[in-house]
Amino acid sequence: SLQTVAGEVGGATPEAHGSLAAAELVRSGARDPDALALAEPGLVADLAGWHAVFATNALTVVYDPDSEYAPAIREDWRTALAREEISVGRTDPARDPLGYRTLLALDLAGREGAPADAIRANADVFPETQLLRTLEAGGVDAAFAYRNMAVAHDLPHLDLPAELDLSDPRLADHYRRAAVTVGGETIRGEPIRYGAAFLTDRGEPFYRNLVANAERLREYGFGVPDEFPVVRGRESDPAANTGTATRPRAPATAADQPVEHGRDNR
């Protein structure tokens, strides 16, 4: 996870939150970080005035290998996750991008005939940082999560088709067919991307450590296209051949599993 990568930096004090929650902590003054890494590059830009897009991810279905329903989930997750006797977890769309991206993926799946409404209704909502811990404890049979989360927890997962997993920039127009409303705001599907920035000089080394090491990010389950990092909003490129762990003045504020977010009328 990003928290793991950040924690490998000497002196870093990473703090994990869903991206929307992390942004609100900074915006409200409850946290004053030296660096940020979130699953919404647009949120980073709002807070720092610039951002580097440094990684991608994919939605997956993670499942408990010890669940009696594991074979059914592996055979056909669409049908299995709609069954009332199979417990499913997802995160809160009002608190983190994973939550609304899950709903966007279900919207796309529903357009292909999957029982999306039944799956959504059957899924309980958990904080992002507790989702897979709950699964590991036997609290749910399956959960919608990022690929890097499954890798970090060493859990089996089902790769969704590229048409559903929000991972492929070439399918951006297809993803935008999906839309969900959260808090009165319409969010459209977009490829998943991660953004980072440093807010103080003290945060720059940690930022560079995160953004620079593409191989380590890939090892942790993230995708890193050859052209990344891409810096926006700065004349000079502070990420060239380098990147960060999030480290705060107070405790660091970073999203554990943190696309330019696809919000209409932003």
Provide a role label for each language-model segment.
Residues 1-89:
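N-terminal segment of the mature folded domain
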Residues 1-7, 20, 65-266:
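Exported/periplasmic ABC-transporter solute-binding proteins
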